[in-house]
Amino acid sequence: MPLPWISLIWFAYLIVITVLIVVASVFIHVYQTPRDRSSFVTFMCVFSIAALLATVMLLPVDVALVSSTTSSALGQRKEWATQEEVDKITYSLTVIYYSLYFLDALLCLVGIPFAYFWHEEYDEVAFEAGDQTPCKRFWAATKYTLAFIAVVIALVLVGFFAPMSESQPGHDLGYWRGFLIENRGEHAFTFLLGFVTTIGSCLYVFYTPSGLALLPALFLRRSYSFANQTLVGSTAMQLDFNRERQRQLEGRCGGNSALLSPKDRRELDTLVREERTLIRRQRLIEGRQEEDQSWPVTVYSKLKTILRPFRLLGGFSLFLVGLSTWISLLMTVIDKLINSPCKHHCGYVLSRTNFNPISWLLIQSSRAFPTDYIIFALIVFLFFWGSVVGVVAVGIRFLWIRIFQIRKGHTSPQAMLLATAMLTLITLGLNYSVVMMLAPRYATFGPQTFCDLAPTSSEEQPDCSNHWHLVKPCSEKADSTAADNTCTPSVASTILNRVALNFPLFGALLLWAHFLFLGIYLVILVASLVRSPRLDERQLDEDAEEAEEESLLASTGRSGNPT
């Protein structure tokens, strides 16, 4: 393979990885609370997110490398692209993919849990007294992590001893027969990958469509910061009413609350607590109003007003892109449901993919690398951004109970680790969705074509230089010797198709999960565009209480360290 071309492809991937590390670092820095930062937790979060996104972003490199072996204009393999060279390319990509997938699984199932328990085991008092050493802390965290290691070992053993899939009578797999695994080790790895991908897809179909549907509304509708004036008035009114009611109750007892009835005493206690909350809220709002009057905020507000048309354009563009991806996913899932040759028996694999707008766009742009890489990266970042917005909006929940809330500058290390674990699993679901649902034809063969013409001899390739109409795009169902000798599927599609074929239950669950994805996106999109924004007063009160605590801690620190 020409060295300059392969260097360009891998250099583009290196740039993307650098951008991924920056994106992950910014995300963690923005959302993690500054009061309780942990360098190890931050490293694990950044590394995990970057590693998962690097796995997804390897697809355009995969497609570019296998597609470079053929001439899309002639439908022939290039002179240097012998079968030995093609095998070297696919083997190196397979090693990289398996290494990344294994690393992803370890990070999700072992690395992040260990970081969680490592942080939980930290005792500041014991550490300062010398009673807690790093070795003791490491051993305590490892003991709790052993349960997760046991889960990984159990999954590998289940995959190792699970029955091998075979071609069933009445379901001729044809092209897909070669995807059935006979190696026990590869069978175990495929099961582990299918399991974590299915778990990730369960999170993906809830959080990602929620965030994607909310994104356009965040750009199109105005921010509710203007509600501060209204909130100041309503808070002052509530405070006046509260104090007037307290005066009435205190007037009944002459200032001695012991003379009040139990009902009035409970009401007075409630009013006192409510008064403290309202005072904190009033101080917080006044502080924010003072910040809004500073010149940087004033300049920023004026700049936002000037750029308002571009913000609307961005929101409308996000709406169109989201709608295009929704249509592409809908077309593929219906195509799989109707045209799969063996339906749920083989995980709804397709013999030939019908037209898909996103896949078509990527195939056309792949003829001028790295144009397809840029478009693909923007789509992946959009889905990841939507996943983050979904996690922030919904929070970390067990069933309907919210365990942690993800907020800018207010997320604890424990919540940050759980959010990272969720995002890594979601990214595995995103990886399957992009390859198998969003752009299946691009992800499988890219722009590869073959010459559907009988060769003049067994050693020569078919020549379509005078028969351009016989140059056809590669597909799984291309029943032609020329296609078998010319077309090379991407390694990513091969690995994920093996998951669906060897474990059809995973393939069926992943297909039906995308119907849920489409439905949730549609419902939340309509609701977000129709429903007006509301100010969360409960969250405002929590911010006020936290600001008061920080102010007290700061004043205590100043009084304890006189200059």
Swiss-Prot record:
Pfam families found in the cross-reference section: LMBR1
Region (Disordered): 537-563
Record key words, sorted: Cobalamin, Cobalt, Glycoprotein, Lysosome, Membrane, Transmembrane, Transmembrane helix, Transport
Annotated GO MF terms: cobalamin binding
Composition skew (Acidic residues), residue ranges: 539-551
Biological process terms in GO annotation: protein localization to vacuole
Primary location recorded for the protein, binned into one broad class: membrane
Protein location: Lysosome membrane
Topology class, membrane: Multi-pass membrane protein
Residues bearing glycans: 228
InterPro entries: LMBD1_LysCbl_Transport, LMBR1-like_membr_prot
Transmembrane segments: 8-28, 40-60, 95-115, 144-164, 188-208, 314-334, 374-394, 416-436, 506-526
GO cellular component, one term: vacuolar membrane
Function: Probable lysosomal cobalamin transporter. Required to export cobalamin from lysosomes allowing its conversion to cofactors.
Family affiliation: Belongs to the LIMR family. LMBRD1 subfamily.
Protein name: Probable lysosomal cobalamin transporter
